[in-house]
Design a protein with these regions (language model features):
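Generic N-terminal amphipathic, Lys/Arg-enriched alpha-helix
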Residues: 1-10
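Divalent metal-dependent catalytic cores for phosphoryl transfer on phosphate-bearing substrates
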Residues: 6-7, 33-140
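A positional/architectural concept
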Residues: 15, 19-22, 26
């Protein structure tokens, strides 16, 4: 579905998702090795599903993908009996929440999503992994 989406949609969900998955899973494994109580398989599953809601934004909602895909991600995952994954996936870019109230798995996914960004060049999106300093500069500019 992600590869088909690359052809049909203006964003490259496949490359972004793979990048986020790699960063999130590696960071989760490192955190677990450092002694933090991290559910690495949960981080992996949530990273793979975090933008699935973008495919649910149709009609008038298509213009509001950045705002609504969290809701559609939650709806799809919870509707398929994956509430635990839905909770992590749907909170992957919530700047207005109190971070101390989020599970570590959500924080790792937020970090990974923050680092993997796309830029538009020649009508196509190019996805890359940015350094933390570069990611901050992009967000704050």
């Amino acid at each position: 579905m992600l590869r088909i989406g690359r052809e049909l949609l203006p964003f490259d969900a496949a490359s972004h998702t793979i990048g986020v998955h790699n960063i999130a899973t590696l960071t989760a494994q490192c955190a677990k090795e450092a002694g933090l109580p991290v559910d690495v398989p949960l981080v992996s599953a949530a990273a793979l599903c975090h933008d699935i809601g973008k495919f649910g934004c149709r009609g008038a909602d298509a213009k509001r993908i950045p705002y609504l895909h969290y809701y559609y991600t939650w709806q799809w995952l919870s509707g398929h009996g994956m509430e635990h994954i839905a909770h992590i996936s749907a909170n992957h870019s919530t700047w207005d929440l109190e971070f101390e109230n989020l599970p570590v798995e959500s924080l790792l996914l937020i970090y990974a999503d923050f680092r993997v960004r796309g830029t538009r060049e020649g009508g196509r999106e190019t996805v890359r992994i940015y350094s933390l300093a570069e990611a901050y500069a992009m967000i704050l500019s």
